[in-house]
Regions:
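Long, low-complexity, charge-biased intrinsically disordered regions
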Residues: 1-319
Length: 319
């Protein structure tokens, strides 16, 4: 047999994303853009003494600038258009499935249109809403093999599709469903009927909170400080007894980062589980303190406060 050597990368190849990123980096650097050290998909440069940011997600670009002159903004777009054919959508109101609602002192990020879409997709548009995404007494950790009857019941159920759709929400604008979705995602290989009922409960919860989202408010320089709230359960998972860490990070009153994740080793006590959550939050704090500095908004030099409710884990480092 023979092997053909391609003269250029084409869409669909394994190396196509890497080749596109290398080309994009080269082109943007040639017109003065510099990638962030802590987030290489964000670029910055100066244009007529005005700082400009460019957020890149594959081939979707979000241009951020304080420039008021339409001419400057047009010139910035024309520079990018000199390399690629672009579609200018004007002021950002929708980006990567997220609605952006601008007001004088804040921006609200929500996904109401996407929620309506998935409710229709899974025939839950007219369902009865509930006030919580998950019930604590439901044994959703059960990983037993499905019976033949249960396999038949789940044969054509779009469980994997539903989990994927919900994960898209939970990592972007809906931290309130992160625990429920993370728990249900453990069963995509062989879900049981009760897991599908739990998925539908998450959808019913979304039905009653369609317009909820994140509100990012202006923060005075004197209040620009990072706070992190960390917590953990202890051995809640009856199958492997791994605990779950959770954290929410805020600047001012705005939530900018969150995490809900199973721990990788078994904690011998609630103190150990909480201490692991503290450790993960401390690692997040390093990155979260550095990233705003690249935007020119460094948190105050005071140490980042991580809030915890377990006295043992707070006293442990002092011993």
């Amino acid at each position: 047999g023979k092997v053909c050597r391609l003269k250029k990368s084409i869409y669909g190849l394994k190396q196509a994303p890497r080749a596109w990123n290398a080309r994009l980096m080269k082109d943007l650097k040639s017109i003065g853009y510099i990638p962030f050290m802590h987030a290489e998909s964000i670029f910055w440069r100066y244009k007529d003494d005005i700082k400009v940011y460019l957020l890149v997600y594959v081939d979707d670009f979000l241009l951020i600038t304080s420039a008021k002159s339409p001419k400057i903004i047009s010139n910035l777009k024309d520079e990018i258009a000199s390399f690629y054919t672009i579609k200018d959508l004007g002021q950002a109101e929708y980006f990567l499935g997220i609605n952006l609602e601008h007001s004088a002192h804040s921006i609200k990020l929500s996904q109401s249109a996407y929620i309506h879409k998935i409710l229709d997709r899974f025939n839950m548009a007219e369902c009865k809403a509930v006030v919580s995404p998950m019930l604590s007494h439901d044994n959703l950790f059960d990983k037993r093999l499905a019976t033949e009857k249960e396999k038949l019941l789940m044969l054509n159920v779009p469980y994997r599709e539903a989990i994927g759709a919900l994960m898209f929400l939970s990592v972007r604008t809906r931290p309130d469903i992160a625990v429920a979705v993370g728990t249900l995602a453990m069963h995509v290989q062989q879900p049981l009927p009760k897991h599908w009922e739990a998925v539908k409960r998450v959808l019913r919860y979304l039905r009653g909170s369609v317009d909820e989202g994140l509100v990012l408010c202006k923060v005075p320089t004197s209040e620009f400080n990072l706070r992190i709230y960390a917590d953990a359960d202890w051995a809640t998972n009856s199958e492997d007894r791994l605990s779950r860490s959770g954290s929410v990070s805020q600047i001012g009153d705005s939530t900018i980062w969150w995490k809900s994740r199973k721990q990788t080793s078994i904690a011998a006590s609630s103190c150990e589980a909480e201490y692991m959550a503290l450790f993960e939050s401390a690692k997040d704090a390093i990155w979260l303190r550095n990233l705003p500095c690249e935007f020119g908004f460094c948190p105050r030099p005071a140490p980042t406060t991580i809030f915890q409710d377990n006295q043992g884990s707070l006293l442990w480092p002092k011993q």
